[in-house]
């Protein structure tokens, strides 16, 4: 057993644990006011919309303590649901007939009439003979404050991706390994203020895990009762990534408690949750990130030692700068790391107008717009795409469009088209700001951000909820090293030891897996980062399908 200060124990793992001076009960660390948690979408603009790096905030959801914004929905007396019980009949730049039996629904459902809170969603039926026999899975990207429509639906496991070889935002290409092959898929933009979801009440933009979870439970009740009653009794799963490590168990807990407390409400048939590269226990996830950097040779051992000695892992992270020596250690890490793709360390970066000006993966992403650099970037990224397409083909993704490190540019351009918004029943009342992948107006609770959600996972397991925790093994932000630490703290008995698992179509090792009592599984997805379903779609689909069927990932 290894002792972590502040009373945390880490058992049965060989990863060293923090020894920082800041792990002293009651120590207060003064922080620079200008530094906030930064979600990665604006750091290296590629596919995921939900990750953490601890650098100056640029355009993502803020950690609440500042004054409220006035950017709320301005049309209070036009509140109402804009969803339709009819599937989409057309979608610009894409032939819906290519989806086979699958249909897409989209719209907005009100979750609080008094304040005017309404959440936007897309829903993709399973590509099976009878979708009413398939489970329903809700996917949530993290942030906090990032879009599951821009993330999951448009750039990870959804039915299509932006076409990197077409003019920006004009065409989509089919995802052959979309998760709706095996499940009905619901993608929800939450909390209000994210994406096309809105509120008429400024104070709603200050939000945390509890209200987010309550709003999502209300949304689900109305979704199943009003929009898809034919699916109300189906097995229901929740999946997510990054800050989804908070969202998912909080929502699952609200559902379990609601089912027990309100027997006359619709019973949501929650069966399990899955979280990828999940932010769960801040001090362990923070330490795990720094440890990953040094063990993957992107920073030096002396720099790691200095971060470990001088930076506070119990705050928002080793890279939210402290005064003095911690600040110097952060500078050293930035210089050593260079401008790599920090959430997929062996993948190319997006060489756009901002990234071209940066020299470090941890540097401020703010930069003036440069059409020339963007044009250069499009050419360079096509070259990167050809290289990574070959790598994905070798891994079994034969018909996939290839990894595009600038996919979020295409997503934003596409979702801001008026004809696309009309097709999706989105933005019908005219939001006073464009759609963006991560909200700049939501002010998320710092207290919740720094709260461990481990007790919720333990309680869900005790209530018979199946849990899959998975890690893309080359993510350097919420990496496997931190996840292994908090999984060990679950206190569960191991029932099947660590072993490889094989993706059967390609007969290649898809990752590694260990199983615990009470249907708790921890798996890795080999050669993928923070957005495993995009980078390794076939392996991720096999893992997801195995989880839904309550099967086992095996080497056979």
Regions found by a protein language model. Give the residues of each.
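Short hydrophobic alpha-helical segments enriched in small aliphatic residues
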Residues: 7-13, 24, 29
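Terminal and linker regions of secretory-pathway proteins
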Residues: 3, 7, 30-556
């Amino acid at each position: 057993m290894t002792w972590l200060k502040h009373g945390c124990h880490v058992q049965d793992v060989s990863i060293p644990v923090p020894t920082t001076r800041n792990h002293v009960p009651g120590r207060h660390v003064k922080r620079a006011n200008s530094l906030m948690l930064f979600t990665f979408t604006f750091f290296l603009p590629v596919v995921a919309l939900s990750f953490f790096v601890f650098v100056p905030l640029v355009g993502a959801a803020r950690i609440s303590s500042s004054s409220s914004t006035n950017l709320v929905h301005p049309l209070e007396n036009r509140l109402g649901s804009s969803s339709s019980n009819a599937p989409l009949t057309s979608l610009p730049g894409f032939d819906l007939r290519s989806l086979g039996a699958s249909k897409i629904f989209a719209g907005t459902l009100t979750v609080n009439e008094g304040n005017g809170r309404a959440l936007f969603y897309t829903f993709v039926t399973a590509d099976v003979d009878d979708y009413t026999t398939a489970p329903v899975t809700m996917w949530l990207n993290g942030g906090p404050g990032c879009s599951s429509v821009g993330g999951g639906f448009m750039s990870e496991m959804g039915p299509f991706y932006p076409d990197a070889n077409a003019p920006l935002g004009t065409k989509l290409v089919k995802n052959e390994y979309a998760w709706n092959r095996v499940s009905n898929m619901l993608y929800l933009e939450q909390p209000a203020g994210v994406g096309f979801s809105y509120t008429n009440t400024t104070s709603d933009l200050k939000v945390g895990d509890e209200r987010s979870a309550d709003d999502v439970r209300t949304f689900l009740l109305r979704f199943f009762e009003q929009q898809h009653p034919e699916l109300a009794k189906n097995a229901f799963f929740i999946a997510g990534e990054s800050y989804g490590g908070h969202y998912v168990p909080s929502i699952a807990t609200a559902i379990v408690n609601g089912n027990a407390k309100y027997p006359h409400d619709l019973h949501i048939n929650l069966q399990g949750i899955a979280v990828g590269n999940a932010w769960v226990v801040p001090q362990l996830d923070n330490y795990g990130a720094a440890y990953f950097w040094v063990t993957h040779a992107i920073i030096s051992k002396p720099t790691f030692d200095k971060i470990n000695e001088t930076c506070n892992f119990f705050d928002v992270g080793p890279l939210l700068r402290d005064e003095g020596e911690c600040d110097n250690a952060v500078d050293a890490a930035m210089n050593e790391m260079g401008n790599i793709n920090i959430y997929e360390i062996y993948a190319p970066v997006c060489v756009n107008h901002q990234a071209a000006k940066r020299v470090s993966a941890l540097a401020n992403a703010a930069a003036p717009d440069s059409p020339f650099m963007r044009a250069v970037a499009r050419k360079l990224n096509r070259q990167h795409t050809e290289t990574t397409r070959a790598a994905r083909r070798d891994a079994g993704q034969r018909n996939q469009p290839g990894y595009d490190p600038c996919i979020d540019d295409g997503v934003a351009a596409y979702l801001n088209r008026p004809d696309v918004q009309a097709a999706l029943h989105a933005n019908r009342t005219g939001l006073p700001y464009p759609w963006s992948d991560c909200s700049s107006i939501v002010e998320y609770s710092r207290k919740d951000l720094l709260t461990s959600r481990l007790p919720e996972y333990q309680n869900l397991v005790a209530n018979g909820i199946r849990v899959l925790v998975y890690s893309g093994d080359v993510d350097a932000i919420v990496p496997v090293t931190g996840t292994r630490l908090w999984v060990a703290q679950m206190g569960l008995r191991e029932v099947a030891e660590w072993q490889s698992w094989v993706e059967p179509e390609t007969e290649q090792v898809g990752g590694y897996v260990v199983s615990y009592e009470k249907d708790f599984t921890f798996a890795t997805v080999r050669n993928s980062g923070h957005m495993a379903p995009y980078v390794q779609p076939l392996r991720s689909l096999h893992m997801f399908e195995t989880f839904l069927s309550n099967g086992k990932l095996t080497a056979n």
